[in-house]
Design a protein with these regions (language model features):
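Accessory alpha-helical/coil subdomains and C-terminal extensions
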Residues: 1-134
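C-terminal catalytic subdomain
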Residues: 101-173
Length: 173
């Protein structure tokens, strides 16, 4: 999944940077409480100062005003700003950013369904900074894409499946 995120972020960055008009592209990546997958987006950088310029993880509090200031400051050196955010970014009070604009439902386990922080930030950037903004939600593809599957991943998946079937046949739960 990390390889997929890094590669996809790189491709989105290349697309975002073909225009000379100021723009912000916000990429929303899985990660309710752990930001390792979003952190993998840093691997998309080819040099210091390359996009994604800003990466936000759920392990730290997210401040909307500080975010806007950093995006605005990034335009001093870059015409196009790519931002990667974990779906679970939250403010200092623990409120998920995706809840700012909508009532998040709950899944079958009672967890809040997190989606939409990218869209919220896209609208915020557009209205407050007056620049072109768009958001991309990697969503299901980052979890199920086999395009970047490594041989080791495949072997471990087969072994885990075999172990699970054997445990079930032995009556283990």
């Amino acid at each position: 999944a990390a390889r997929y995120v890094a590669s996809t972020v790189r491709e989105i960055t290349l697309d975002a940077c073909v225009y000379e008009k100021k723009s912000v592209t916000i990429i929303e990546i899985m990660g309710r409480h752990a930001g390792w997958l979003t952190g993998a987006a840093a691997l998309a950088r080819k040099y210091v100062g390359d996009n994604p310029l800003l990466i936000y993880l759920p392990e730290t509090d997210f401040d909307v005003e500080e975010f806007l200031q950093k995006v605005h400051a990034a335009f001093e050196k870059n015409c196009n700003v790519v931002v990667c955010v974990s779906e679970g970014i939250h403010d200092k009070d623990g409120t998920f950013i995706c809840e700012y604009d909508s009532a998040a439902g709950t899944d079958a386990f009672g967890h809040k369904m997190l989606a939409g922080c990218g869209k919220y930030l896209e609208n915020l950037v557009r209205s407050r900074l007056g620049v072109k903004a768009r958001s991309v939600e990697l969503n299901v593809s980052q979890r199920c894409s086999a395009a970047m599957l490594a041989g080791t991943d495949q072997q471990e998946g087969i072994l885990a499946g075999e172990f699970g079937v054997q445990a079930a046949l032995n009556g283990e739960t």
